[in-house]
UniProtKB/Swiss-Prot annotation:
Pfam families membership: TMP-TENI
SUPFAM superfamilies in the cross-refs: Thiamin phosphate synthase
Magnesium as UniProt keyword: yes
GN (gene name): thiE
Enzyme class (EC, first level): transferase
Task performed by this protein: Condenses 4-methyl-5-(beta-hydroxyethyl)thiazole monophosphate (THZ-P) and 2-methyl-4-amino-5-hydroxymethyl pyrimidine pyrophosphate (HMP-PP) to form thiamine monophosphate (TMP).
Pathway the protein takes part in: Cofactor biosynthesis; thiamine diphosphate biosynthesis; thiamine phosphate from 4-amino-2-methyl-5-diphosphomethylpyrimidine and 4-methyl-5-(2-phosphoethyl)-thiazole: step 1/1
Protein name per Swiss-Prot or TrEMBL: Thiamine-phosphate synthase
Database matches in PANTHER family: THIAMINE-PHOSPHATE PYROPHOSPHORYLASE, THIAMINE-PHOSPHATE SYNTHASE
Coiled-coil region list: none
Reactions mediated catalytically: 2-[(2R,5Z)-2-carboxy-4-methylthiazol-5(2H)-ylidene]ethyl phosphate + 4-amino-2-methyl-5-(diphosphooxymethyl)pyrimidine + 2 H(+) = thiamine phosphate + CO2 + diphosphate; 2-(2-carboxy-4-methylthiazol-5-yl)ethyl phosphate + 4-amino-2-methyl-5-(diphosphooxymethyl)pyrimidine + 2 H(+) = thiamine phosphate + CO2 + diphosphate; 4-methyl-5-(2-phosphooxyethyl)-thiazole + 4-amino-2-methyl-5-(diphosphooxymethyl)pyrimidine + H(+) = thiamine phosphate + diphosphate
GO cellular component, one term: cytoplasm
Organism from which the protein derives: Limosilactobacillus fermentum (strain NBRC 3956 / LMG 18251)
Molecular function in Gene Ontology: magnesium ion binding; thiamine-phosphate diphosphorylase activity
Amino acid sequence: MLFKNEILRCYLIGGSQDTHHDPDEFLTKVEAAMQAGITAFQYREKGTSTLSKAETLALGQQVRELATKYGVPLFVDDDLELAAAIKADGIHVGQKDQRIEEVLAAVSDQLMVGYSCNTAAQVAHANQLNVDYIGTGPVFPTISKDDAGSALGVDGLADFVEQSAHPVVAIGGISLDNVGATLTSGCAGLSMISMVLGADDVAGTVKKILELY
C-alpha cells in the first residue's frame, strides 16, 4: 500500500489494554471506529497488556480481517515479526523501540513506516530518513501512555510541523475540545487512543473528529 497524507487524518491506536483488558470489547470498538471512517489503525498491544504472544497474534489476525473488510490501513507498533505475520500495511517505531535504521533496512519499502519524534533533534534525525510520517507529542497531557513525556502544546507542535520534512500526525491528550486548535498547527492528522476507545459512542466520536476538518 502506498502512503498518502490522508491516511493520517483520523489515526486510531490501541490494544486490549485500552478496553479494560477485554479483547472482545476491543474488537467491537475497533470495528465501530473503522465503520465510522477512521483513516488508519495501529495495533499496539503494549504497556499493561496481559496477552501472551500467541494471544497477541490471534487478536492481531482478527484486527487484520476487520481492516481488510473496511479498507483501513493497518499498522503494527514496534514488532516486525507480528507485522509480517498479520500482513500489516505498515509499522510504527518509537524512540525506545528497535533502531529505526534497522527497521527501514528490514522492510525495504514493503511497509509504510512511521517514527515517533518528541524533540527537535529527533525531528532533524527523521528528516534524514526515508520514513513516511512522524508522530509527535504528547500535544496535551495524557494518561494513555505512561512514558509519554511532557506536553508540547499546539505551538510546540507547530514548530515541529515546520521543521519536519515529513507529514506529522499529532498524538497525546487529543479531545473534541482541542481538535480544532491542534489542526491549526498544520499537522497532517490526529492520532488518538482513549478519546475513541474510551468513548461510550465510538462511531459518533469518530464522525465528530472527521467533521472538524
